Amino acid sequence: VTTHVLEFADVHYTYPGAAQPALNGVTMAVPAGRRCALLGRNGCGKSTLFLHANGIFRPHKGQVLWKGVPISSRRADLQALKRNVGLVFQDPEQQLIAATVAEDVSYGLCNLHLPEAEIREKVRRTLEAFGLSEWADTPVHHLSLGQKRRVALAGVMVMEPELLLLDEPTSYLDPWQTEAFVRQLERIHAAGTTIVMATHDLDFAYAWADWVFVMDAGRLVLAGEPERVFARRDILEVLQFKRPAVLELWESLPGHVKERLGPGLPKTTGELAERLRLL
């Protein structure tokens, strides 16, 4: 039986003064334990959805549910939601508010009024896990973009959320930084955290995710396993999405070659090249 950590039931939201709703009846469920990619054109509602997911915004109509229970506007409910659902913004500058790396990572814990010794130990472990120990006392404004992204992620993960939301986390990172960031995400997921990542990178989404959501005009239009979602050429063409390069290459191969390459679709062009090399 599939369990869902977070659900949206007919959620509507319109920004003040906007002619069109940002969310126009979104109904979707985030399956527990998955690596989910959230895809959609700019302005489709991805970031607004995330702001509802951890209680920063409240729906004008509809409900957000955590593990099947509707989230009320009670302060205690919203605080519990923020602990359970961690959100990392696209721009780390919006998230990093303290002077030093260690102070920033400890900020959320301090708001929980935990004992100082417990806070110090949690921060120490988190800085170590994210490779930030040597920068503990470094002013945040001295860091590179990639380092700031790591600090923002560490500041969320120190709270030990069950669900991690990432808004375009690999944008403006070079390939080495992206690879390091993805390795960090693999460790987080392996420890039991469900992840939802908003991204425009369809090749990355296909290779990394095991569940895909597609939004358009404030609605959910597709959801499912990557192979099924990216097989829907009709919808992808309307949204002007290019299919992942590895799928286009795979489909260009003669049938007898594909048969010899073994079962299952390759996830990356590198994997496809390796299979071809071994023929």
Task: Kindly give the residue locations of the regions a language model identified.
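Conserved ABC ATPase "signature" C-loop
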Residues: 217-218
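H-loop/switch region of ABC-family ATPase nucleotide-binding domains
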Residues: 199-200
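Helix-to-loop junction immediately C-terminal to a conserved catalytic motif
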Residues: 54
